[in-house]
Amino acid sequence: MPKSGGECVENAIDDSLRRDKNNLKNFMERFDEKQFERVAEMIAGNRTHGKKLFITGEGRSGTVGMRMAASLTSLGFSAQFVAAAEWVHGELGHLAPGDCVLMISHSGKNATMMHLLDVFKKREVVTMGMCGLKESPLLTETDAAIFIPSDEELLHCVPTRSVISQEAAVNAIMSQICAICNLREEDFRRNHPANDLIKPENP
């Protein structure tokens, strides 16, 4: 007997959550901890030396980058997100030698990002890459890089599992940075005087 519409919807929800869980499980089995440590150390060192950090990307990778920049800013870092397409329209003026740019791309072969990698090198900035393609120049030609494995996307094309992997990677980097810089809750709250942060409820 064919499944009802309600059953199909419920199965889709359960299937999606199961796939998300498996995606993170596979991510943890394949990630390289030393890559994460290297990027976190470079971002922390960038702050120590008074340099700026820029995060860039396109599409959903850009959205992940925006969240990372906002979170780092809340912790007192000079971090700014710049959409990949905007660099060649004047945003390059932000850069000074020694600044860092973290480039995020799931495919690792975006034409805009490939062009920017050459541009950033000529500007003598430190480049870091995050992508899901091991052969990508974002992993092989940057000063530091993180491979972000992910499972099959929704409908084989909608960014879903790749976004979960990227967000997990960002959380791991942020956690390592907090440990390196000995950051505490008060450091975050100092930049949130509105005191509107929500504390998790007890289960």
Q: Model-predicted segments: where are they?
A:
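Glycine-rich phosphate-binding loops that contact phosphosugars or nucleotide phosphates
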Residues: A44, K52-C181
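An N-terminal, well-structured beta->alpha segment
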Residues: P2-H49
